[in-house]
Amino acid sequence: METRPRLLSRIHWLGHDAFRIDGPPVIYLDPWQVPADAPKADLILISHEHFDHCSPEDVNRLRQPDTVIIGSPAAAAKIKGAQ
């Protein structure tokens, strides 16, 4: 069973409101200004469509062919392939 400190060590603040949870799976929350060498995403969650929460450039850099992207309808409209 995973201990709490180990779980917390997998959560990374990326600046502003962006976070990455290392897995597997690798999960991003509101990726914005993510470093170019960041791990690819298995799941991307977007809270809303504002530019600093819904960055098509960052999403496209992080996504893989099987990455699941979930966001509000307004956010999904900005990201091709989002649900």
Predicted regions and their residues:
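Conserved beta-strand hairpin/beta-sheet module of binuclear metal-dependent hydrolase folds
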Residues: 1-39, 43
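Active-site metal-binding motif and surrounding structural segment of the metallo-beta-lactamase
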Residues: 32-77
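Metallo-beta-lactamase
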Residues: 2-8, 14, 70-83
